[in-house]
Amino acid sequence: MANRQQPTSMPIHKYRPYEQVDIADRTWPDNRVTVAPRWLSTDLRDGNQALIDPMSPARKREMFDLLVKMGYKEIEVGFPASGQTDFDFVRSIIEDETAIPDDVTISVLTQAREDLIERTVESLVGAKRATVHLYNATAPVFRRVVFRGSKDQIKQIAVDGTRLVVEYAEKLLDERTTFGYQYSPEIFTDTELDFALEVCEAVMDVWQPGPDREIILNLPATVERSTPSTHADRFEWMSRNLSRREYVCLSVHPHNDRGTAVAAAELALMAGADRIEGCLFGQGERTGNVDLVTLGMNLFSQGVDPQIDFSNIDEVRRTAEYCNQMEVHARHPYVGDLVYTSFSGSHQDAIKKGFDAMEADAAAKGVTVDDIEWAVPYLPIDPKDVGRSYEAVIRVNSQSGKGGIAYVLKNDHKLDLPRRMQIEFSKIIQTKTDAEGGEVTPKDIWAVFQDEYLPNPRNPWGRIQVKTGQTTTDKDGVDTLTVEASVDGVDTVLTGSGNGPISAFFDALQSVGIDVRLLDYTEHTMSEGASAQAASYIECAIDGQVLWGIGIDANTTRASLKAVVSAVNRAAR
């Protein structure tokens, strides 16, 4: 088919394609991520600096406590040399002996100036586990425009900064602190690979990584500039060419300028990265840092333990929204208000059938649904695993069909409607949504269902109200039913005979001019135990109409008679 799109007048001449990596024998596409990486949350640093209203100390502490509770073991807590607020916060969590668990490492950021480095290391005095994170920009545009320096001069900034970190750590910190070092060639995505490698090697020459002396080399996509696959190529190239690789923790720090930060991080792991830096829900400068929640839940959905607890994802969201003063989008993966919700009729039908199949499979194996592999269409994970209920899984509007409506009735009211009754009732709901528009809530669905099918003692409707009924069976097996009822407002006694109570009731109705023919009948219990109620569903042909009725009662015979009354009264409505 021909492409009928037309060229635009947009100034594409201002931009050039991103340079590809010459790595013909790349191996990362064949790799799989089978264990969680090391995670670092930079919500309190990179995330906080991007807020319109940066966090107060109280909000910072609440965010820190949340990250610890979730299981993050590396947390970047600020830029203490940038101002007194960040410095005081770092000191406050160090001096509070209950704040930082023994297995949590705090990290602080600094530029490569001596006064800033000294102040940064000073903020860490008394910390149990701490890392200084030093960075300087290495990309050509920064060398030319910002620093106006040569490659050697830029490299020397990194070398001198690393040397100063070592000197001040030895001078200011004591044996109480397990000290680590991280270096980032900022704007790695726009830095020549051979130069990025050269700078990292020079930094390692100063730090001297070895057994029990790891170095973290963080390669940030400070601005996302390429496809995730090209980003992965760059990581594989660096991982292959770094010396002392066994003592290097190779870290990825994607931003989301092209909207592919999650994919970039995942492919970087396949290409050799050991660690990911990001923020909850993708907070951060411009389009944000990579989203740690999506990354962790992506692993979870593939059967890989993220080693971070997302079991109460709404609590995580509420805390993040409070601390950041920014809302999480309703469509945000795994956590948004609508991500486990289907409005489409075909989706809802598939979801309902998926739940039914899961229950049947579990019952056949003698286990619970939680013990078998999750397999429900349109739901990549079980919402219960992150603390969500099934209440919002199916919501009804004008695009919805029978499956969604039936799901609501079964899930909320234990009524498992027969398929043709589902179709009948969905048309009733469709009429309502077409007339009124918008969403129909589960409460609305139940109200319409009650009004359509079930008797209302406070506002009776229909020709017949049954008061009592009694069945006897003669020696030939013929049932005789005697019913005390109100017909068209007049109390009367109806009697009929037949093969079973329903047939006998049909015969009794003939005496008041109501001709009923049975088309289908089904019933089920609504719960377990001696006091369980039964739901009976009956499809009848009544005076040329085909209608369903429902009856609910602890006695199955009474339930079936109520179902007949429901259908008959609907026919006369």
UniProtKB/Swiss-Prot annotation:
GO molecular function, one term: magnesium ion binding
Keywords noted in UniProt: Amino-acid biosynthesis, Branched-chain amino acid biosynthesis, Cytoplasm, Leucine biosynthesis, Magnesium, Metal-binding, Transferase
Record-listed Mg(2+) binding positions: 46, 253, 255, 289
InterPro entries (alphabetical): 2-isopropylmalate_synth_dimer, AIPM/Hcit_synth_CS, Aldolase_TIM, IPM_Synthase, LeuA-like_post-cat, LeuA_allosteric_dom_sf, LeuA_N_DRE-TIM, PYR_CT
Catalytic activity of the protein: 3-methyl-2-oxobutanoate + acetyl-CoA + H2O = (2S)-2-isopropylmalate + CoA + H(+)
Residues covered by region (Regulatory domain): 456-573
Domain of life: Bacteria
Signal peptide: none
EC number: 2.3.3.13
GO aspect biological process, one term: L-leucine biosynthetic process
Biological role stated in the UniProt entry: Catalyzes the condensation of the acetyl group of acetyl-CoA with 3-methyl-2-oxobutanoate (2-ketoisovalerate) to form 3-carboxy-3-hydroxy-4-methylpentanoate (2-isopropylmalate).
PANTHER family noted in UniProt: 2-ISOPROPYLMALATE SYNTHASE, PTHR46911
Name the UniProt record assigns to this protein: 2-isopropylmalate synthase
Organism annotation: Streptomyces avermitilis (strain ATCC 31267 / DSM 46492 / JCM 5070 / NBRC 14893 / NCIMB 12804 / NRRL 8165 / MA-4680)
Gene coding for it: leuA
